[in-house]
Amino acid sequence: MQRTLSIIKPDAVKKNVVGKIIDRFESNGLRIAAAKKIKLSKCDAKAFYAVHKDRPFFNDLVDFMVSGPVVVMVLEGENAVAKNRELMGATNPKEAAPGTIRADFADSIDANAVHGSDSLENAVNEINFFFASREIC
């Protein structure tokens, strides 16, 4: 049983599609082991996305992630990392397969509705960034 981190980004929260996105996870065998709605600080957003700090889009990404509330979740299930990435679709919603979260709910490569851990190792680190072990059940 794997765990992965999912973030429903400010654009999707603003569009009020959180429930529809959660339904995609649950109807595809991913269980929500923890969830909370938060407003990221600029400091937290910079720390979370530090791997991208030298990329040209870093400041825009940070500004976007602090533009409104997000929903952070720990998803649990068989091959959770890969399954979540499959459900999300390509980073650019124009390239995302029909029926994926990004194809259905994202507006652009920047406002792309969701974040998901890209590896098991990153999933552990990302989960620990947002959740104490006692919050996950």
UniProtKB/Swiss-Prot annotation:
Cytoplasm in keyword set: yes
Name by which UniProt lists this protein: Nucleoside diphosphate kinase
Family matches, as PANTHER family: NUCLEOSIDE DIPHOSPHATE KINASE, NUCLEOSIDE DIPHOSPHATE KINASE DDB_G0292928-RELATED
Its biological purpose: Major role in the synthesis of nucleoside triphosphates other than ATP. The ATP gamma phosphate is transferred to the NDP beta phosphate via a ping-pong mechanism, using a phosphorylated active-site intermediate.
UniProt gene name: ndk
Cofactor dependency: Mg(2+)
One Gene Ontology cellular component: cytoplasm
One GO term (biological process): GTP biosynthetic process
